[in-house]
Amino acid sequence: MILFTALLPPQDVVAALESELARQGVDPALRWSPPSNWHVTLGYYGDVPEIPELALSGRPAPSLRIEGAGTFPGVLWLNIAGEGLAELASAAGAGADGRKYRSHLTLARYAKEDPDAGKAWAERLMAFRTEPWVAREAVLMRSDRDERGTSYRVVERYPLNG
């Protein structure tokens, strides 16, 4: 089973983002992630046979906000800023593989051969901001893929202090 830990945006943040995307219009060149899949990854564990032991419960709850956008090859994302996020991600295992942690919310995917599609949207969303919110829990998510695409489901919850 493919597992990762994440923070889920609250409904008011999801609604604000949905409204902004509706205002901007839909671009068929991008494969948009459904709002039910929006999350901020803390740690990625890959395909593992059992649930990892995680010491996340009771850690300080980070205050987060969306500010700005960017791209990875083939991925359009929103930047997640906030105090305490890097520490929580580190506790969840981010960076253990030697890669730098980049807090983000994946919005869409596009053909790597067409980087301009993602870059144009990143520019359009660069000024998008949300009010801060406090992430009161981290979740362990399972990723499932079928003919309809990828879906995520919460396996465990870790309450945070704050």
Model-identified regions with their sequence ranges:
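Histidine-dependent nucleotide/RNA phosphoesterase domain, centered on the 2H-phosphoesterase fold
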Residues: 1-162
